[in-house]
Amino acid sequence: MAEITQIQVESHVFPPEVKPPGSDKTFFLGGAGVRGLEIQGKFIKFTAIAVYIEDDAVSSLAVKWKGKTADELTDSVDFFKDIVTGPFEKFTQVTMILPLTGQQYSEKVVENCVAHWKSVGTYTDAESEATQKFLQVFKNVSNPPGASILFTQSPLGSLTISFSKDGSLPENGKEVIVNKQLSEAVLQSIIGKHGVSPEAKKSLSARLSDLINQHENPKKE
């Protein structure tokens, strides 16, 4: 694989490789960017977000996406869906630029997830139970600037949630929630069709386009 570089988002530097909690594998940095909102004519940056994926992702994505440019990938809803739902592990690090309580963060995530699931008719008791667990994990968590919320997503359907105050990664997660829809929804909310970080999407497209197009012999599914 081509050399993977670090990415700096505001004052936070995301390293090229990490070993996330809840996995025994090393992941490479797929892309990173800010999440912000336009408030009274000014762009306010709330979090810096990095998306890491395991090495197997490149050969998996190359089957369908080899030969595409970074711009073509950025404009493709299906490309990001294939990252979210692909048969490989993903790790997302959400680092605070401005302080945000765990309750504020988790309630917004759950609100968006439930609205989407209801709109497509996939909201069941299992999802209701999973979102309640999700809210509980974040209940008394404070996230000052520099603190991170960490998500390790298994293709088997588990979501490992962890926290870090100083940028270091703990060995073990705080909670594991087994629900495939919730597991995928967290990353979907960041890089999906209405993802909250267009900058992270562009970064992913540019870096993965290079890796995919350099990849030899894409495997057939």
UniProtKB/Swiss-Prot annotation:
Substrate binds at T47, N112, S189. The record marks Y105 as: Important for catalytic activity. It holds the Pfam family Chalcone. SUPFAM superfamilies: Chalcone isomerase. GO terms for molecular function: chalcone isomerase activity. It catalyses: a chalcone = a flavanone. It is an enzyme of class 5 (isomerase). Its EC number is 5.5.1.6. GO terms for biological process: flavonoid biosynthetic process. Pathway: Secondary metabolite biosynthesis; flavonoid biosynthesis. Part of the biosynthetic pathway for all classes of flavonoids, a large class of secondary plant metabolites, many of which are brightly colored. Catalyzes the intramolecular cyclization of bicyclic chalcones into tricyclic (S)-flavanones. Responsible for the isomerization of 4,2',4',6'-tetrahydroxychalcone (also termed chalcone) into naringenin. This is Chalcone--flavanone isomerase. It comes from Dianthus caryophyllus. The lineage of its organism: Eukaryota, Viridiplantae, Streptophyta, Embryophyta, Tracheophyta. The gene is CHI.
